[in-house]
């Protein structure tokens, strides 16, 4: 196990020894998730209150309080040392589907889930210089959002890193 926080999703290899992923660093709050009785009797009953306090869900991005409690962010995970470090905390505030550029491992292509206005974004982020190089928006089909029929963008690079593609259900 390279990250025992109880929460890691959407990962991709950056190189032969490093993974990037969305998730939480190991902390006492996240460690509680491993115990089913704590989950059942403490964490799950408190989730509705937690969501009301922060005013959003994980698909809408982290609030400051959410980030402090859960520690959710993009992580660099070194598989040899087990060291986890977060990056882009003030810029990349939402879970996505990261893809590493084959010609430049400092470039991450990722996406967001649709917001309340049915807008989802995909972007290229420079991990070395900590900024978003480019960002595009697409309309999603609102009636499918937050259902099993939704279509996440899942952006991917071409083999040479010259082009990107996204999944979409929009008509243009």
Regions from the language model: what does each represent?
Residues 1-38, 59-73:
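Beta-propeller domains
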Residues 1-9, 41-49, 78-95, 126-151:
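Multi-bladed beta-propeller domains
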Residues 4-29, 91-111, 142-163:
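Conserved beta-propeller blade repeats
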Residues 12-14, 120, 134-137, 169:
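Generic alpha-helix signal with a bias toward terminal, lower-confidence helices
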Residues 26-29, 113-118, 170-172:
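Short glycine/acidic-enriched loop and turn motifs that connect beta-strands
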Residues 51-75, 83-131:
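Loop/turn-rich, solvent-exposed surfaces of beta-rich toroidal or solenoidal domains
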């Amino acid at each position: 196990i390279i990250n025992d926080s109880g929460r890691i999703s959407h990962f991709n290899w950056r190189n032969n020894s490093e993974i990037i992923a969305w998730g939480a660093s190991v902390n006492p709050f996240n460690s509680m998730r491993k115990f089913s009785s704590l989950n059942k009797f403490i964490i799950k009953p408190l989730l509705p209150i937690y969501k009301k306090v922060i005013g959003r869900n994980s698909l809408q991005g982290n609030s400051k309080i959410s980030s402090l409690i859960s520690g959710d962010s993009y992580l660099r995970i070194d598989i040899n040392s087990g060291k986890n470090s977060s990056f882009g905390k003030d810029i990349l505030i939402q879970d996505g589907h990261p893809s590493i550029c084959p010609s430049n491992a400092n470039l991450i292509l990722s996406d967001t889930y649709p917001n309340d206005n049915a807008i989802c974004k995909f972007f290229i982020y420079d991990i070395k210089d900590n900024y978003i190089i480019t960002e595009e928006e697409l309309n999603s089909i609102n009636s499918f959002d937050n259902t099993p029929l939704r279509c996440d963008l899942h952006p991917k690079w071409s083999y040479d890193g010259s082009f990107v593609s996204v999944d979409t259900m929009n008509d243009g």
